[in-house]
Curated annotation (Swiss-Prot):
Record localization: Cytoplasm
Species in which this protein is naturally found: Artemisia annua
DDXXD motif (motif): residue ranges: 299-303
Cofactor details (free text): Binds 3 Mg(2+) or Mn(2+) ions per subunit.
Protein name: Amorpha-4,11-diene synthase
Any one GO MF annotation of this record: magnesium ion binding
Amino acid sequence: MSLTEEKPIRPIANFPPSIWGDQFLIYEKQVEQGVEQIVNDLKKEVRQLLKEALDIPMKHANLLKLIDEIQRLGIPYHFEREIDHALQCIYETYGDNWNGDRSSLWFRLMRKQGYYVTCDVFNNYKDKNGAFKQSLANDVEGLLELYEATSMRVPGEIILEDALGFTRSRLSIMTKDAFSTNPALFTEIQRALKQPLWKRLPRIEAAQYIPFYQQQDSHNKTLLKLAKLEFNLLQSLHKEELSHVCKWWKAFDIKKNAPCLRDRIVECYFWGLGSGYEPQYSRARVFFTKAVAVITLIDDTYDAYGTYEELKIFTEAVERWSITCLDTLPEYMKPIYKLFMDTYTEMEEFLAKEGRTDLFNCGKEFVKEFVRNLMVEAKWANEGHIPTTEEHDPVVIITGGANLLTTTCYLGMSDIFTKESVEWAVSAPPLFRYSGILGRRLNDLMTHKAEQERKHSSSSLESYMKEYNVNEEYAQTLIYKEVEDVWKDINREYLTTKNIPRPLLMAVIYLCQFLEVQYAGKDNFTRMGDEYKHLIKSLLVYPMSI
């Protein structure tokens, strides 16, 4: 039966075109003589600083500050062994009973490292009446450190909930009087209130923290120089990778083969940077970028072009996972399906050479699950059905894509993704579920209005409005509260998941951080704001001045 006998009505989204053109297509590598030796010498100096601070207990608070600076400057991957050793020594020495300065920093760094230290240390911040001490209210840096520590809280930590309210209120007051605060610190406070450190992407943080750090009289010249050199070296690698994927994308020719779908290869690579910016994850970034570009085409086909009958055929083709399915598809779907098959076949062959077919099969099942649930959404849209949250969530948490994207990232990390890790991933761990909830809720908050202008499945907002009999504004309030709460669940699972390599857990955290950036105020992936555009340029266009 021909599907073209009658011109179908399509839910066209009118996506804006790419703003980048061929800007990143060509990359000319620039070799700076002697930089590698300079970097190696600087790294030796930093290692010595870490050793000296660790060897003297009186300097352990300074050690924490040094580690924090290394991480925020974007160079911790050079000192992973030293940082791991230092924080392990700190934990073995003090346990939960830290008695030095910078308690908030100690708490944040230990939890970030995976040590589930208690929050009892913050009882020292309160007076005999249970209120936070006035001396803390007058300590701007102390307030900021405590505020940042609260983002590591888990459900039930009341003292950190109180601390969040206290610090947020005091810091907000300070932003209303710019003249009473150091200008650089004033900017730091504004950034923190907008997005605490734990919810910021490390690479973006490096781009923004390096200039701030340079303005501090106390900055370490060795650290600063190393951070700037490394930023530029990594940026060169990233631009080379981006050039590669842009050429791959141009060969697909989206304007010819999928003109109504989103042309977002640069944004896909930016997402890849969010999943891991370090040099050792180059392969992971390239494959992740290609996969996200293909997944975006598939998602748009379901959301913004395909008819219900066409989508049933495409779903069956994905289930069969065979290039022989091309002949069964409508003409416009064939280039998309072929690109999909070619992209995943490339990775399958690579992993097969490493003896990791198990890892590829894990990723493949997540793709199939994603498409099956897109089909459920298409069915709801076709029927005009608004499901309850109980019916809605199991489907839309999957179609939000967080789980799929996490496992896609893992395909490029086969060296640390053990067989036990595969079993963990396919078991639908709570960490995946909570990151999926976060992604879905943030997406729905920012895409709801645009999606409801065409035939589209209902969002979380509509399910909340229907189930709780509330208006849209109140439903948004409920979802923002859920987003805040689900971060606490994510933190708990991050801290309590055992026997899984920490980089795999951090890949989930990086994804959550990226979602916070991507959906900051709008759906920047689809309709980019000026601030988001500047973030991309800060990582991929503008080098650090040395």
